[in-house]
């Protein structure tokens, strides 16, 4: 069997950095990674190395969904990252096509292409793959610049505005049945003063700006995004939670042999938000869902991306309890937090606040499964970020602040655990 080339080690990737949290205690800590959108990203790898990033989370965004990632393309990306003294730590994402999710006629062909891409990644020494099994909508927010009161802004989800989009713009059949009477009353009030500009903003925020850069279903170049979105939703007519689960199990069982051969860790991202939306089934939203997914395919390579932000957006989720339960099957950690407001709206919170309890999460993962790749995920727009045209949620200064906060938490937790050097 052909062996994979030796990828850059974490030690090699941080040799020139004065303070490496990875090795401060002589043992592995959470690896500080950063989601980077390729060479066209305005945030360069040189910038990331200067702020202490050790590993890169990225994808081959130029390859259409469902096409094979060639070994040559993978190697080119890996070597480019390694030239900047970091490593390609996680693929986020190798997209799972909608046809695989709803069980279309071409799913076996698409799964075979997925397997080839996985094998090529394994041959090139890239072994952690974040993906999602959310139908149509990768993640949802209604406001991308919600003011925080200190000059910064964060992502926000309003149930009423989302319901307005569903009932008044998308005009989904039977949509009203999915909302409370209070929410529908608010939708009617909004309909009296919402302008065409307001409606355009909602469309952009919900199905364009948050989607085009992550899965390509709808992009800013599409002239009729609402019509495209309706056609995508129609693909899931008749697909309930049990059928989507069966399709996920089918996919995972098909790819596990190559994952075992090349030690590929698949880590599913939780539903974001972990709530019923648009009548679509959701299968990674709570404790019971995660337990089902891991037990349905009990292979160690079938694991979880522990996204604290997504999970904390559901008031039903006790995030630290989930971390304790599933740390051993977690392959990748997203650290961010949310505040759930009365009525169920939620706002992305500071990494030092909110209901995710990030300090406790670091304690849990450092104690149970140290060495996992971690990224700080979304962060506020601040210090001119809003002028740079960054992808929604992925600011530079906001994430840099969050990374510094989390790095301080990591060092403090190691001191608490009694393993940090004294004096």
Where are these regions (language model features)?
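Histidine-acidic metal/acid-base catalytic patches
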Residues: 17-23, 30-33, 38, 46-49, ...
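Glycine-rich, proline-tolerant flexible connector loops at the mouths of alpha/beta enzymes
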Residues: 60-75
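A short glycine/small-residue-enriched secondary-structure motif
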Residues: 50-54, 86-101
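Internal, well-ordered alpha/beta segment that forms a basic, Gly-enriched binding/recognition surface
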Residues: 117-176
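Asp-box/BNR beta-propeller blade signature and adjacent active/binding-site loops
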Residues: 83-87, 116
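Catalytic domains of carbohydrate-active enzymes, especially glycoside hydrolases
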Residues: 40-59, 84, 124
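N-terminal amphipathic/basic-hydrophobic helices that include classical n-h-c signal peptides
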Residues: 1-25
């Amino acid at each position: 069997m052909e062996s994979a080339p030796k990828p850059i080690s974490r030690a090699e990737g941080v040799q020139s950095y004065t303070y490496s949290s990875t090795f401060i205690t002589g043992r592995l800590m959470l690896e500080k990674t950063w989601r980077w959108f390729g060479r066209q990203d305005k945030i360069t790898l040189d910038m990331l190395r200067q702020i202490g990033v050790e590993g890169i989370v990225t994808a081959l965004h130029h390859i259409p969904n469902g096409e094979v990632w060639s070994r040559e393309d993978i190697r080119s990306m890996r070597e480019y990252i390694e030239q900047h003294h970091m490593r390609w730590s996680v693929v986020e994402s190798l997209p799972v096509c909608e046809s695989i999710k709803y069980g279309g006629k071409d799913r076996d062909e698409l799964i075979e292409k997925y397997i080839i891409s996985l094998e090529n990644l394994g041959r090139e020494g890239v072994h952690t793959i974040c993906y999602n099994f959310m139908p149509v909508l990768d993640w949802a927010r209604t406001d991308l610049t919600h003011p925080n009161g200190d000059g910064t802004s964060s992502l926000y989800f309003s149930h009423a505005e989302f319901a307005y989009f569903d009932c008044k713009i998308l005009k989904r059949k039977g949509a009203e049945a999915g909302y409370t009477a209070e929410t529908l009353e608010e939708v009617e009030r909004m309909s009296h003063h919402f302008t065409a500009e307001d409606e355009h903003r909602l469309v952009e925020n919900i199905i364009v700006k948050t989607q085009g850069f992550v899965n390509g279903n709808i992009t800013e170049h599409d002239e009729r995004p609402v019509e495209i979105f309706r056609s995508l939703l129609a693909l899931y007519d008749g697909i309930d939670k049990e059928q989507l689960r069966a399709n996920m199990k089918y996919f995972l069982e098909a790819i596990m042999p190559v994952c075992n051969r090349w030690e590929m860790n698949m880590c599913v991202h939780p539903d974001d938000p972990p709530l019923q939306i648009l009548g679509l089934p959701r299968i990674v939203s709570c404790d019971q869902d995660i337990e089902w997914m891991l037990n349905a395919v009990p292979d160690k390579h079938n694991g979880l991306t522990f996204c604290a932000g997504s999970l904390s957006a559901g008031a039903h989720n006790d995030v630290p309890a989930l971390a304790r339960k599933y740390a051993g099957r977690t392959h990748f950690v997203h650290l961010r937090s949310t505040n759930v407001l009365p009525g169920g709206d939620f706002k992305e919170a500071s990494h030092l606040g909110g209901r995710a309890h990030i300090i406790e999460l670091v304690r849990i993962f450092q104690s149970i499964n140290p060495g996992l790749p971690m990224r700080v995920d979304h962060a506020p727009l601040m210090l001119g970020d809003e002028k740079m045209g960054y992808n929604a949620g992925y600011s530079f200064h906001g994430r840099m602040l969050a990374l510094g906060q989390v790095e301080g938490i990591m060092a403090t937790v190691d001191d608490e655990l009694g393993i940090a050097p004294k004096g």
